[in-house]
């Protein structure tokens, strides 16, 4: 096991971006201090060859300029808030709209656009800790919001622990927006990936991907991943949630509670299997339908729509506007914490 921190490059404003590397005999993870980005996850395929399974860029500036939050920590409220406003006790909080009058991923200055401080975790030999603050009023959100993300390397996976505090009531929903291709980041379409999602329901959403508040059953629909199937099997079905989003882009309601399995995916060409575990109530399955063509990805790679799949563990989108959803209010005396694990092994083929 080894952990190191070194310079990666400069941001567009001239700030130094750090690269943290966590490595053992099976897996190597590289993280950036800009947006707490997961830059590389390298695991061995069934032939013993190293494979980088996340899409990304070679420079800090390219990460800054991309609009897809590639690999980034997203918050203070990930996903969408309808009408860029929400009730908080006796007030209506107005935040920055940045997508069709709604707020996506916290507006213009979320953590996916923030420089973090990074350091070795005191007393531990397998992790780094990243910290950042979103000042009160950033994009309209109340409260000074202090975020800590601890990235730890387990024997076969990456453990992400989020912790947040505030000095005034606000809202919180953290996720990571890595784009996975288990055949290798430069291998093209991910639609051949075999996927399972441990959810009997998904959140109904309107044409702007705003939840209606209803949970719909997956059984008998193309949304059903309770039994393993390829991403491409039903993605072209004449089914409103798929046609509205040009593919999968929905929040699934994970069974049970606590730290438990949420999803699995297998890259058929490498045999690499990824298991997603989380303490959060939802996982957003996104097949990179709107990924803009990239001609300068990592290692000279070209990326296009559907070349990856995201498993964004999360609280429910637009939760502050839906009293029937799990509460996402963050209070000064009620710190936020959640855990997500990406665990890797080799599937039987």
Task: Give the label of every model feature segment.
Residues 1-349:
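An exposed, glycine/acidic-rich loop-and-rim segment of catalytic or binding clefts
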């Amino acid at each position: 096991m080894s952990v190191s921190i070194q310079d990666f490059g400069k941001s567009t404003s001239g700030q130094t971006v750090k690269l943290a590397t966590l490595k053992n005999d099976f897996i190597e993870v590289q993280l950036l201090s800009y947006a707490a980005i997961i830059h590389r996850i390298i695991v061995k395929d069934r032939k013993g060859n190293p494979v980088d399974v996340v899409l990304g860029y070679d420079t800090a500036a390219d990460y800054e300029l991309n609009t897809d939050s590639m690999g980034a920590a997203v918050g203070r409220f990930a996903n969408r808030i309808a009408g860029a406003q929400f009730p908080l006790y006796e007030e209506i909080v107005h935040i920055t709209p940045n997508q069709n009058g709604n707020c996506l991923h916290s507006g213009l200055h979320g953590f996916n656009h923030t420089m973090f401080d990074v350091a070795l975790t005191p007393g531990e030999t397998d992790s780094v800790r990243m910290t950042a603050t979103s000042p009160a009023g950033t994009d309209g959100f109340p409260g000074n919001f202090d975020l800590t993300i601890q990235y730890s390397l387990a024997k076969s996976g990456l453990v992400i622990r989020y912790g947040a505090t505030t000095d005034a009531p606000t809202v919180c929903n953290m996720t990571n927006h890595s784009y996975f291709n288990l055949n290798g980041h430069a291998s093209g379409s991910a639609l051949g990936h075999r996927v399972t999602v441990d959810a009997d329901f998904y959140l109904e959403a309107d044409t702007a991907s705003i939840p209606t508040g209803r949970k719909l059953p997956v059984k008998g629909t193309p949304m059903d991943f309770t039994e393993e199937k390829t991403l491409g099997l039903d993605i072209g079905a004449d089914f409103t949630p798929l046609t509205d989003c040009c593919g999968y882009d929905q929040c699934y309601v994970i069974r049970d509670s606590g730290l438990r399995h949420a999803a699995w995916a297998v890259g058929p060409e490498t045999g690499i299997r990824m298991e997603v575990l989380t303490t959060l109530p939802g996982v957003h399955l996104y097949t990179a339908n709107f990924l803009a063509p990239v001609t300068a990805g990592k290692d000279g790679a070209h990326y296009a729509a559907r070349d990856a799949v995201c498993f964004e563990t999360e609280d429910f989108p637009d939760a502050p506007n839906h009293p029937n959803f799990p509460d996402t209010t963050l209070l000064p005396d009620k710190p936020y914490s959640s855990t997500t694990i990406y665990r890797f092994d080799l599937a039987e083929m």
